[in-house]
Amino acid sequence: MSWQAYVDDHLLCDIDGQCLTAAAIVGHDGSVWAQSDAFPQCKPEEIAAIMKDFDEPGSLAPTGLYLGGTKYMVIQGEPGAVIRGKKGSGGVTIKKTNLALIIGIYNEPMTPGQCNMVVERLGDYLFDQGF
């Protein structure tokens, strides 16, 4: 299965009639493996800051999490494994695997819990596969 198929079929899937706004699979070095059309163009320093927060949990809290220039307030995640952000009625979930970051962006009416489930389910699967 191609990386794009993982984004299209597993991240942009329908959950109770809702769907992520945008999604991507990005390497730890910031290289995009696959992304949806609506996924923002991320800057290398944004991915570097996210990677730093996985190594040093809490480092993003004072400044916020940025994706494509959009700022998200960092909320409770799982240190070293999941970072979650909130902006207005939407937000982002980022799951770290051995080689990649699985990123899902949502807006209402999708809920944070639905976004977490979609992103973390694929992240756990890829982690178990060695990715």
Swiss-Prot record:
A Pfam cross-reference name: Profilin
GO molecular function, one term: actin monomer binding
Organism: Musa acuminata
Superkingdom to which the source organism belongs: Eukaryota
CDD domains, A to Z: PROF (cd00148)
Gene3D superfamilies listed in its UniProt record: Dynein light chain 2a, cytoplasmic
The protein, known as: Profilin
Annotated keywords: Actin-binding, Allergen, Cytoplasm, Cytoskeleton
Keyword Cytoplasm appears in the UniProt entry: yes
Subunit structure: Occurs in many kinds of cells as a complex with monomeric actin in a 1:1 ratio.
Cellular compartment(s): Cytoplasm, Cytoskeleton
Family indicated by similarity: Belongs to the profilin family.
One GO cellular component, as annotated: cell cortex
InterPro entries per record: PFN, PFN_euk, PFN_sf, Profilin_CS
Keyword Cytoplasm assigned: yes
Role this protein plays: Binds to actin and affects the structure of the cytoskeleton. At high concentrations, profilin prevents the polymerization of actin, whereas it enhances it at low concentrations. By binding to PIP2, it inhibits the formation of IP3 and DG.
